[in-house]
């Protein structure tokens, strides 16, 4: 059986995902067969695993860090929040059903078996499995039936390292408080802790380390600074949208309206990484900037609900004005569906609204259907005759006159639509901006020249940098026990 360690946090967004990715790369660089695992993830940023089916994009990134094929078993339970129907539940890559919060709590005990079975599959043939928890084990109101943190750790017998985020303040109280409220059996699973996102002179925290050990008895396995490479990794969660830069003075301004159920917004990361692009995320209450040359409508977990919110924010009027000025629009997946004349949902898959008018910027209509398209795809852009690689995760079929001008040929089949004036483009293909040739041609069409970086190589280099920084700042004795 493989060795395993689980990183749990004192809260959400403490940096567990990046630490797991960095440790996976560090172990892989030392020649180990290492695999990531997350029992339960809640995110609308999904990927298509190499063995088919959906997993969180964070686990897809961690598999990339581990230099191992991704699998649905690396994230056996994925919760995708949507509208009034609660969350869609994905189990081992396939749609299991839908449930609201309290109903899901009742489902968790029966999902534990699937989680443990997937963990066994991931561990089979591996030297090391690095597990990521969700939220915090201190949420003791959710401990009964837990599958994400201590419920999994105790059942699988995996020791836990607790991660505290010092940047947000109160890290000593967070760690000591977690120790205080955990049950004895759960507390015994914790072997030590890591301080993450430290700024400044580490020696200034020496007294803090002594205080934490005095209250908890836990050793410190390292004080990790802000990792410079982390900013070059794909965005994982909508929480990070609050921190993404607005502005920067790039020659080309691209605006992205942030809708409540935004999905797969890491599609935008390759554009955000370009130094001559100013990518701005627009929140509710803000106007779409009049000087934006391109507006991108990203994916959505609930097209109809997000379309209503788009109108409530006044962004439909902003979009119409943008197009009248000659501005361009790209809609991806749910964003593509919004650009059409009508969205039909006769089975109520997204809720109670069975039909809603779209923005009518493309002469197409979408009908939602229960069959879900989930696959990795290869394509060629018809606009720029450039190769594309990406993935599809969507419900529904889109048809109409503008589909006669497909935006791409995907897996040998026409996909998407282009308006007659060429200003509006829609596609179901996620990940198109990560295709360097396509991104280069797109930016050239706005007058930007120059050589573009290889986006996938830049992510890979960032993972190596993070692994190097962890090797520098984590306790060498602890690391030796983990990765040899």
Swiss-Prot record:
The gene is cobQ. Residues 251-438 form the GATase cobBQ-type domain. GO terms for biological process: cobalamin biosynthetic process. Pfam families: CbiA, GATase_3. SUPFAM superfamilies: Class I glutamine amidotransferase-like, P-loop containing nucleoside triphosphate hydrolases. Pathway: Cofactor biosynthesis; adenosylcobalamin biosynthesis. It comes from the Bacteria. Keywords: Cobalamin biosynthesis, Glutamine amidotransferase. This is Cobyric acid synthase. The active site is at residues 333, 430. One of its GO terms (molecular function) is catalytic activity.
């Amino acid at each position: 059986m493989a060795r395993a360690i689980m990183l749990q946090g004192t809260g959400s967004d403490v940096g567990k995902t990046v630490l797991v990715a960095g440790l996976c790369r560090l172990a892989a660089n030392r020649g180990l067969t290492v695999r990531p695992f997350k029992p339960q993830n809640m995110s609308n940023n999904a990927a298509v695993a190499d063995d088919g089916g959906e997993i969180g994009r964070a686990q897809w990134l961690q598999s990339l860090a581990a230099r191992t094929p991704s699998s649905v078993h690396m994230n056996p339970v994925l919760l995708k929040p949507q509208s009034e129907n609660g969350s869609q539940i994905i189990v081992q890559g396939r749609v299991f059903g839908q449930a609201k919060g309290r109903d899901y709590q009742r489902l968790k005990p029966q999902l534990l078996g699937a989680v443990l079975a997937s963990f066994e599959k991931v561990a089979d043939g591996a030297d090391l499995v690095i597990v990521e928890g969700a939220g915090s084990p201190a949420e003791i109101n959710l401990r009964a039936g837990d599958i994400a943190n201590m419920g999994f750790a105790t059942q699988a017998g995996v020791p836990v390292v607790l991660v505290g985020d010092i940047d947000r303040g109160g890290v000593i109280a967070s760690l000591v408080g977690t120790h205080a409220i955990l049950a004895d059996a759960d507390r015994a699973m914790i072997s030590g802790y890591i301080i993450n996102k430290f700024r400044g002179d580490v020696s200034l925290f020496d007294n803090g380390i002594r205080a934490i050990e005095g209250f908890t008895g836990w050793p410190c396995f390292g004080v990790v600074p802000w990792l410079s490479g982390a900013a070059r990794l794909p965005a994982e969660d909508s929480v990070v949208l609050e921190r993404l830069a607005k502005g920067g003075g790039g020659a080309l301004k691209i605006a992205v309206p942030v809708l409540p159920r935004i999905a797969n917004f890491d599609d935008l990361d390759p554009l955000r990484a370009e130094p001559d692009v100013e990518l701005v995320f627009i929140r509710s209450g803000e106007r779409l900037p009049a000087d934006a040359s391109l507006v991108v409508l990203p994916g959505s977990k609930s097209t109809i609900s997000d379309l209503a919110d788009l109108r409530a924010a006044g962004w439909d009027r902003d979009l119409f004005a943008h197009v009248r000025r000659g501005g361009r629009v790209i809609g991806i997946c749910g964003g593509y569906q919004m650009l059409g004349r009508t969205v039909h949902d006769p089975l109520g898959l997204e809720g109670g609204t069975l039909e809603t008018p779209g923005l009518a910027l493309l002469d197409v209509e979408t009908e939602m259907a229960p069959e879900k398209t989930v696959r990795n795809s290869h394509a060629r852009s018809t606009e720029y005759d450039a190769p594309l690689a990406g993935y599809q995760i969507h419900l529904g079929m889109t048809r109409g006159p503008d589909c006669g001008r497909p935006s791409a040929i995907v897996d040998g089949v026409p996909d998407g639509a282009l308006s007659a004036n060429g200003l509006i483009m829609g596609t179901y293909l996620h990940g198109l901006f990560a295709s360097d040739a396509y991104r280069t041609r797109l930016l050239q069409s706005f007058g930007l020249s120059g050589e573009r970086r290889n986006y996938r190589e830049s992510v890979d280099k960032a993972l190596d940098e993070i692994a190097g920084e962890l090797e520098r700042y984590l306790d060498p004795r602890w690391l030796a026990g983990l990765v040899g």
